Amino acid sequence: MAVLFLLLFLCGTPQAADNMQAIYVALGEAVELPCPSPPTLHGDEHLSWFCSPAAGSFTTLVAQVQVGRPAPDPGKPGRESRLRLLGNYSLWLEGSKEEDAGRYWCAVLGQHHNYQNWRVYDVLVLKGSQLSARAADGSPCNVLLCSVVPSRRMDSVTWQEGKGPVRGRVQSFWGSEAALLLVCPGEGLSEPRSRRPRIIRCLMTHNKGVSFSLAASIDASPALCAPSTGWDMPWILMLLLTMGQGVVILALSIVLWRQRVRGAPGRDASIPQFKPEIQVYENIHLARLGPPAHKPR
């Protein structure tokens, strides 16, 4: 008997949250959360679904129905309008959003048996974003960012194109809240395939993930190439450097011009100026004051 109690203590009861499961769903997609019937029922049990959002600390009642009832409760209006109870007592989430991330669990309560946390799910919403970049040689690249709500480590992310690895020059990064993939064109892409859009997926467990669509590459044919109108980092730095040099030259020119203007009157005052009218006057004046010339007899 003591051994039996020890086993029950170690293994736990069915209503313990041992069935907790992480469910990944892409942003905007639907997901079904099963709630199978407990092994023992007496007909007076009520099945309830609860939700505790990841962004808050409150718990809401999503749906409730009596076990064995032919038509389940359609649910409440408002946020729960996208949540509905199916005929098999599963909870259906339509068009998942970021605020839908959180913990969901079903409970089967009755007079004889209480399955408080019969099934517990941690719903995580996957989302992705796509950016454009340029490599060191000027070739266009794509930056694919895959993240999850609520934030958690993305070490188990795998990047896949079709049924195999991503082609081209790729470099992956993993962080505490997101996973990033840098995709640049390379020799791995064949000519017919490079003219079609590429589908790359960021996959988590159970083949759940986010899909990215990369535009078809047109740089394989020189006739189709068009001059790039984008501003990359080297051109921006060169433009800023040129503008800075122009501003410095203009400032130096203004300073030199001001010094020249200020110094011109000083130089003119130190150099004696020739004035013809004053010189003539002085000659006449000296001639009148001098003694008359002696005439020989």
From Swiss-Prot:
The keyword Cell membrane applies. Residues 257-297 are cytoplasmic. Keywords: Cell membrane, Disulfide bond, Glycoprotein, Immunoglobulin domain, Membrane, Phosphoprotein, Signal, Transmembrane, Transmembrane helix. Residues 17-122 form the Ig-like V-type domain. The modification Phosphotyrosine is found at Y281. Changing Y281F: No phosphorylation. No interaction with GRB2 and GRB7. No phosphorylation increase of p42/44 MAP kinase. SMART domains: IG. Residues 1-16 form the signal peptide. Its main location: membrane. One of its GO terms (cellular component) is platelet alpha granule membrane. This is Lymphocyte antigen 6 complex locus protein G6f. It comes from Homo sapiens (Human).
